């Protein structure tokens, strides 16, 4: 399974299933030196080594020490993503018994292997142990009950996060204090506690009955037991991770904990009244499907699981070629998820789907894309993807998922499956992939339902913005780009280039005198889900982003993870498409195998695409991750940790370009600010001094921010662009020549030099400046404009603040720019949107993304017609200057929802959502949302200034 962090892989099976490397590619050297991980000279072994599956795949997740207690569910289920201990009746093991080459030297992350406890059971105890395949049940009733009294025992499971790495060195030597130092439970032993030790060898049951129980007598301040709040004085600790414990073996069991993990402690509480039955809860280990979802979404995951049970949804992979000789029932179904009552009715009408997928194409000549039907009074959308004689379809309720979004998501799912398994047939027709696909689609439907639930949340916050933006963002074949100052970007690119060069001692060919195992195709690095730098081809970047998006890795990186390591073989279509094409004169790529390595530390996540074969060693079998490459990627991330503060400062900085809140433009707000021109702040700003130092300017703006607590309203709609340059506006042109984002948000306006009219000089009138040089938004893909460090951001905002709209007011509410050539898009960050607040602005954000989804569907139809072979392109003369530019816009009118004044009608505000598609030199999409007062000339200017990229 893809996310099988909680699954244990036996060492014997692992060695049989894991592949190695072709020794012939290493020349005359010994085959024992072909796998670097097998002859490591170090005495340390990676903590993730036991998690590598038989097919070579690895998914290892370890949360940070502070976040693990919060994010992991407090349930008596087996923890995930951390090191495990394998327990038996009276023993605790770290590695399987057949594990070889045990390492002795260790560092804080690699705990010393504890000595295995010797079994001292007698013949009867050994026979019982052999008959039981699992640890003895701890849910036993006490046989020594007083006559006439019915005593039952309640067993309560509690999860505690423990980290033995934080214990002082002297605590490791004092093994008798582990119960207090590690868990925080104080137990006072009685005087006759060792009486059972003097009784010699007795029957196993008699021996266990004489052993002293671990009664909780107190707690250590600040310990995990105190923080948990579920452990009470008087409780009896009877088991640790389903292993029965007592005074004699508790310290030995705790000493074998290898690293940070969550322990399941089972406490016993006697109940003295009759009539209460003992409930034996059969708690099984939580699957990785729920683990990953609960880690990312927390309590929302539980709600979505319950709603999914009643939501009609299904994924099916059907075959159109049926065997008439065999009358096997449901033979046309190659794969189905889920198998539940909710999907039964959709499954029963699969014949309709097969008919539409096959016969409709024969009639119309075009494959079916989607259909809608009413099922039990509910509208359901169905999306199709046909390849050869196979039909892949997804069905979801229309209320939960728009049809336009379902079409795009279906194409993304197919692309991700091909990236993981090469073909759809290989993915759905191999039995070993069934559980992995169940995991894959379970996460998909949980994401769908979560977005729907969050979109109905009242209020405004990060979750609401996530739900609104995902409607459009998750349909874009790209990732959100975080624009950075040039010096920060150069540092990141330099570090990534050093990694890609593989010019390290253990990665060089001269170190082991052999060919390298892999060649790095490219890398891309993320911070909290934002793309910082990309060295991958665009197609590879999109494949990696879709994979990370499907498995919630971008959302997971927004949390502070301790360590994330993912390794699997992938099939990037860009490279496989260019392999072995001798017919073309272009240089074809060698036929090799490709592997994806993802390493995450804290908020950073680095994705690396590697190639085996060609100029590197040829991979055979199912090779697992090589620890040298993993360590070098970790070292790269540690090298970039110094930029953490700068990146946080960038995410928390003021919006650039500047944004306005829709609530500032309501007429009611304008009435309250009627005496704005007579304010003290404006009098201070109207001083004729222009040579004020930056320090005094910051002091002036600080005074303005503290004295002005309201927003500047928008002007009335003008008939033309030249109306913004009236005398009244001209008097204030020289007033705010240098403005900070904070000041502008308080005023709600952006003054500028120039009128922004239609005579062609409006370009300089839309940008704040102190020199005669024009400023434009930086091109994130060009190193033409150098900027200062992020530490000087507060000073630079005064001089380099940019607004896209012309006129005295900043009327830009939201924007999104999608660069198809690079596979990235730029939009305001979450913090930038949160800073605006407002009551009607959240509804504006929601309408913006919903409208952009519809506009983009029109753009996609235009692109498909252009790329279609059946389009009559020869009939039109292709002139670059006359090439059509697609533009669509929708006018909205909104008002406050909760309007209590019955005598007056609620104030209204109109705004536009406009999308434009540029065809040359490459397709580019730009979506903006602005106030209705903006003229057409101003809109044209805003498009021309789209991030400094020439049209």
Curated annotation (Swiss-Prot):
Region (Disordered): 1-32, 189-208, 687-765
Disulfide partners: none
Tissues expressing the protein: Expressed in the neural plate during neural tube closure with subsequent strong expression in the ventral neural tube and in facial mesenchyme.
Predominant localisation class: other
Subcellular location(s) of the protein: Cell surface; Cell membrane; Cytoplasm; Cytoplasm, Cytoskeleton, Cilium basal body
SUPFAM superfamilies xrefs: PDZ domain-like (SSF50156)
PDZ domain boundaries: 187-269
Protein's name according to its UniProt entry: Protein inturned
Primary gene name: intu
């Amino acid at each position: 399974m893809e996310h099988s962090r909680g699954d244990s892989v036996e060492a014997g099976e692992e060695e049989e299933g894991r592949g190695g490397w072709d020794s012939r590619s290493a020349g005359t050297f010994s085959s024992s030196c072909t796998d670097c991980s097998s002859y490591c000279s170090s005495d340390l072994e990676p903590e993730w080594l036991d998690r590598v599956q038989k097919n070579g795949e690895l998914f290892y997740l370890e949360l940070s020490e502070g976040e693990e207690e919060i994010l992991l569910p407090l349930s008596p289920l087996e923890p995930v993503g951390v090191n495990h201990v394998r327990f038996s009746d009276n023993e605790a093991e770290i590695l399987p018994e057949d594990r070889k080459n045990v390492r002795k030297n260790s560092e804080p992350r690699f705990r010393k292997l504890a000595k295995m406890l010797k079994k001292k059971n007698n013949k009867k105890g050994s026979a019982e142990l052999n008959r039981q395949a699992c640890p003895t049940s701890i849910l036993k009733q006490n046989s020594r009950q007083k006559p006439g009294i019915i005593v039952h025992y309640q067993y309560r499971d509690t999860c505690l996060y423990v980290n033995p790495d934080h214990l002082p060195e002297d605590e490791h030597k004092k093994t008798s204090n582990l119960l207090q130092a590690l868990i925080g439970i104080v137990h006072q032993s009685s005087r006759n506690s060792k009486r059972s030790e003097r009784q010699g060898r007795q029957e196993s049951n008699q021996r266990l009955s004489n052993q002293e129980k671990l009664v909780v007598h107190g707690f250590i301040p600040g310990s995990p037991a105190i923080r948990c709040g579920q452990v009470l004085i008087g409780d009896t600790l009877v088991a640790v991770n389903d292993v029965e414990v007592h005074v004699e073996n508790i310290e030995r069991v705790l000493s074998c904990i290898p690293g940070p993990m969550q322990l399941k402690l089972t406490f016993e509480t006697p109940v003295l009244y009759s009539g209460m039955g003992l409930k034996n809860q059969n708690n099984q280990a939580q699957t990785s499907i729920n683990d990953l979802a609960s880690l990312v979404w927390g309590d929302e995951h539980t709600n979505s699981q319950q709603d999914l049970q009643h939501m009609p949804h299904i994924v099916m992979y059907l075959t159109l070629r049926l065997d008439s000789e065999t009358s096997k029932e449901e033979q046309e179904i190659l794969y189905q998820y889920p198998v539940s009552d909710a999907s039964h009715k959709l499954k029963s009408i699969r014949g309709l789907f097969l008919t539409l997928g096959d016969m409709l194409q024969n009639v119309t000549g075009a494959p079916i894309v989607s259909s809608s039907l009413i099922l039990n009074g509910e509208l359901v959308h169905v999306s199709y993807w046909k390849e050869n004689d196979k039909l892949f379809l997804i069905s979801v309720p229309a209320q939960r998922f728009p049809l336009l979004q379902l079409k795009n998501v279906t194409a993304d799912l197919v692309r991700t499956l091909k990236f993981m398994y090469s073909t759809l047939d290989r993915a759905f027709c191999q039995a070993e992939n069934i559980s992995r696909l169940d995991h894959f689609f379970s996460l998909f439907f949980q994401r769908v339902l979560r977005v729907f639930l969050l979109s109905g949340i009242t209020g405004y916050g990060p979750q609401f913005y996530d739900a609104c933006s995902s409607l459009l963002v998750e349909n874009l074949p790209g990732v959100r780009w975080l624009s950075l100052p040039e010096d920060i970007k150069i540092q990141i690119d330099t570090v990534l280039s050093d990694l890609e060069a593989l010019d390290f001692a253990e990665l060089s060919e001269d170190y082991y005198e052999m060919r390298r195992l892999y060649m790095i195709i490219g890398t891309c690095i993320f911070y909290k889900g934002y793309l910082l730098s990309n060295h991958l081809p665009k197609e590879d970047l999109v494949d990696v982003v879709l994979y990370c998006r499907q498995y919630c890795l971008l959302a997971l990186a927004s949390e502070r993870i301790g360590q994330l390591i993912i390794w699997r073989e992938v099939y990037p279509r860009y490279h496989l498409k260019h392999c072995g094409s001798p017919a073309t004169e272009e240089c074809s790529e060698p036929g090799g195998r490709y592997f994806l390595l993802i390493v995450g530390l804290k908020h950073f996540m680095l994705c690396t695409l590697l190639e085996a074969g060609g100029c590197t060693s040829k991979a055979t079998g199912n090779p697992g991750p090589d620890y040298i490459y993993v360590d070098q990627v970790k070292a790269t991330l540690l090298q970039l940790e110094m930029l953490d503060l700068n990146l946080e400062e960038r995410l928390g900085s003021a919006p650039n370009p500047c944004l306005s809140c829709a609530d500032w433009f309501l007429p009611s707000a304008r009435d309250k600010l009627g005496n704005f021109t007579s304010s003290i702040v404006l009098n201070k700003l109207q001083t004729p001094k222009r040579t004020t130092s930056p320090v005094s300017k910051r002091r002036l703006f600080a005074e303005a921010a503290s004295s002005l607590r309201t927003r500047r309203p928008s002007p009335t709609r003008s008939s033309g662009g030249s109306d913004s340059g009236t005398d009244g506006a001209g008097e204030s042109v020289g007033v705010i020549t240098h403005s900070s984002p904070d000041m502008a948000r308080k005023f709600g306006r952006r003054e500028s030099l120039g009128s922004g009219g239609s005579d062609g000089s409006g370009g300089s009138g839309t940008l704040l400046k102190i020199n005669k040089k024009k400023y434009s938004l930086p091109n994130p893909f060009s190193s033409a404009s150098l900027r200062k460090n992020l530490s000087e951001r507060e000073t630079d905002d005064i001089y380099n603040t940019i607004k896209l709209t012309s006129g005295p007011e900043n009327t830009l509410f939201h924007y999104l720019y999608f660069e198809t050539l690079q596979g990235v898009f730029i939009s305001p960050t979450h913090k930038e949107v949160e800073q605006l607040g407002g009551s009607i602005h959240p509804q504006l954000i929601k309408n913006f993304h919903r409208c952009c989804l519809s506009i983009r569907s029109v753009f996609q139809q235009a692109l498909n017609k252009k790329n279609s072979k059946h389009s009559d392109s020869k009939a039109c003369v292709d002139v670059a200057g006359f090439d059509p530019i697609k533009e669509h816009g929708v006018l909205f009118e909104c008002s406050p929802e909760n309007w209590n004044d019955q005598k007056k009608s609620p104030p209204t505000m109109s705004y536009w959502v406009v999308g434009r598609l540029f065809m040359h030199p490459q397709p580019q999409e730009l979506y903006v949302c602005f106030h209705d007062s903006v003229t057409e000339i101003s809109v044209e200017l805003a498009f021309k200034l789209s991030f400094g990229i020439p049209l």
